[in-house]
From Swiss-Prot:
EC number: 7.1.2.2
GO molecular function, one term: ATP binding
Key words, A-Z: ATP synthesis, ATP-binding, Cell membrane, CF(1), Hydrogen ion transport, Ion transport, Membrane, Nucleotide-binding, Translocase, Transport
Protein name as annotated: ATP synthase subunit alpha
Residues that bind ATP: 172-179
Segments of this protein annotated with the region Disordered: 513-549
Gene this chain is encoded by: atpA
Length: 549
């Protein structure tokens, strides 16, 4: 009988091979249990190692965000449909913080706050993902605002100019044209986009928070008709969405925009509106049993907006020189800008445009209140030509508003006050502008020059806008060199000013008012003395011209 010749080494290697190829069928993961759920909030027991702002996975693939880390439970905000979440269901950790996909493929698309497309045009191929909670650029990483961002709205570009990297608040009651101002600004970037120059191009992100679905659809339609969807992304969290989506939407929009900013590009983001985001965050906080403060808002509602708006910046040249310009919208009640959320956002932003209901109802649109509106940064980014012609515009309009109130009670006014009232009425008429019709900056300069230079003083108020429109049509057709000079040099030299005055005076001769009268001012002629009447010749003593020093 043959002996077995198995060595100890063979046995050892066989055992090692078997142990090395062994895989366990068990895995270790933290699992929690839903204690109660409702109104978009769930309390989960277990999950001792969960992080704040971590994503949790509920049954059916529904996601939630861990916000409250209590001693025995976790308070989570459910993102999406929460109707099927019930007590006793299991909840898993994902080990990830909330992030969204970003990239150029998002241009022209409509997405939800999770970065998922909702426009029915298929999936979006993302370049990378970006966390929603990111630190804003530090002081060292920024530079001062020095490039203009033209809105195409005369009243804003002349009196409250906006620079690239600035945060300009648009504030006013409902139905005063806040969204229209921002949509006009997006439409006005089309000319820059068509140049193909990355230094001029401005990508746009429109964040709709708590808006009606029809409103979001009409904004999208206006952008498509204006050719602006090519460079715009819409982040939509309509009124029908949960409070969690409304809270997250502005952060999603800023994450998409920051990707381009850190890539050296220029971006404009519109938050429409942050009042509804604050209300959604208040609802979440109250449901999570956080202690309420003023107007029942939680104590960190200021931080909610400050950490969002501080992401708007003009980056230093070392970081590529990109910029993110923010236009947050705040809705007031009865023109009260001293309420909690309005004062918070006013203190965070670099200026505000205040839209007033009374002006809107009077037909002054955009209904910007000059006295309360201000830009604390943009003046440094205003082009020189606009600075020259619009220097006295704000003062003239403010004086007009004061005199207008006084004139209602005064029976007779002196000649100076009457002239100020007449000039002011024409300036107000000049600054009116139809919706979705932004104006190039060179045409704005000519338009403002008409008013502040006194060229409209002889034109009846009701004919001011027709005079402006027909003059600009004439200049586009016959004097294109004037527009190109202002556009290229961004200055209004003495030669350009003289040529412009000459064109205006020549145009006036052929322009007739609505009553058929000429708008050329009559030359002032002094009456003759009685003893000179009937004489063949009259000697007139003229003062000797003074010598120039």
């Amino acid at each position: 009988m043959a002996e077995l010749t198995i060595s100890a080494n063979d046995i050892q290697s066989a055992i090692e091979e078997y142990v090395g190829s062994f895989t366990s069928d068990t895995s270790r993961e933290e699992v929690g249990t839903v204690v109660d759920a409702g109104d978009g909030i769930a309390h989960v027991e277990g999950l001792p190692s969960v992080m704040t702002q971590e994503l949790l996975e509920f049954p059916g693939g529904v996601l939630g965000v861990a916000l409250n880390l209590d001693e025995h439970s976790v308070g989570a905000v459910i993102l999406g449909n929460f109707e099927n979440i019930e007590e006793g269901q299991q909840v898993k950790r994902t080990g990830e913080v909330l992030s969204v996909p970003v990239g150029d493929a998002f241009l022209g698309r409509v997405i939800n706050p999770l970065g998922q497309p909702i426009d029915g045009r298929g999936d979006i191929e993302a370049e990378t993902r970006r966390a929603l909670e990111l630190q804003a650029p530090s002081v060292v990483q920024r530079q001062s605002v020095k490039e203009p961002l033209q809105t195409g709205i005369k009243a804003i570009d002349a009196m409250t100019p906006i620079g690239r990297g600035q945060r300009q608040l648009i504030i006013g009651d409902r139905k005063t044209g806040k969204t229209a101002v921002c949509v006009d600004t997006i439409l006005n970037q089309r000319q820059n986009w068509e140049t193909g120059d990355p230094k001029k191009q401005v990508r746009c992100v429109y964040v709709a928070v708590g808006q009606k679905g029809t409103t979001i659809a009409s904004v999208r339609r206006a952008l498509e008709e204006g050719g602006a969807m090519d460079y715009t992304t819409i982040v939509a969290a309509p009124a029908s969405d949960s409070a969690g989506f409304k809270w997250l939407a502005p952060y999603t929009g800023s994450a998409v925009a920051q990707h381009w900013m850190y890539d050296g590009k220029h971006v404009l983001i519109v938050f429409d509106d942050l009042t509804k985001q604050a209300e959604a965050y208040r609802a979440i906080s109250l449901l999570l049993r956080r202690p309420p403060g003023r107007e029942a808002y939680p104590g960190d509602v200021f931080y909610l907006h400050s950490r969002l708006l501080e992401r708007c910046a003009k980056l230093s040249d070392e970081l590529g020189g990109g910029s993110l310009t923010g236009l947050p919208i705040i809705e007031t009640k009865a023109n009260d800008i001293s309420a909690y959320i309005p004062t918070n956002v006013i203190s965070i932003t670099d200026g505000q445009c205040f839209l007033e209901t009374d002006l809107f109802n009077q037909g002054v649109r955009p209904a910007i209140n000059v006295g309360v509106s201000v830009s604390r940064v943009g003046g440094a980014a205003q082009i020189k030509a606009m600075k020259e012609v619009a220097g006295s515009l704000r003062l003239d309009l403010s004086q007009y508003r004061e005199l207008e109130a006084f004139a209602a009670f005064a029976s007779d006014l002196d000649a100076t006050s009457k002239a100020q009232l007449d000039r002011g009425a024409r300036l107000v008429e000049l600054l009116k502008q139809p919706q979705y019709q932004p104006m190039p900056v060179e045409e704005q300069v000519i338009s403002i020059f008409l008013g502040t230079g006194g060229h409209l003083d002889s034109v009846p108020v009701e004919d001011v806008r027709r005079f402006e429109t027909e003059l600009l049509d004439h200049i586009r057709a016959s004097e294109e060199n004037l527009l190109s000079t202002i556009r290229d040099t961004q200055k209004l030299t003495e030669e350009t000013e003289e040529a412009l005055t000459k064109v205006i005076n020549h145009f006036k001769k052929g322009f007739a008012s609505s009553t058929g009268e000429s708008v050329v001012p009559d030359e002032h002629v002094e009456a003759m003395d009685e003893e000179d009447l009937g004489k063949e010749s009259v000697k007139v003593k003229k003062p000797a011209p003074q010598k120039k020093k």
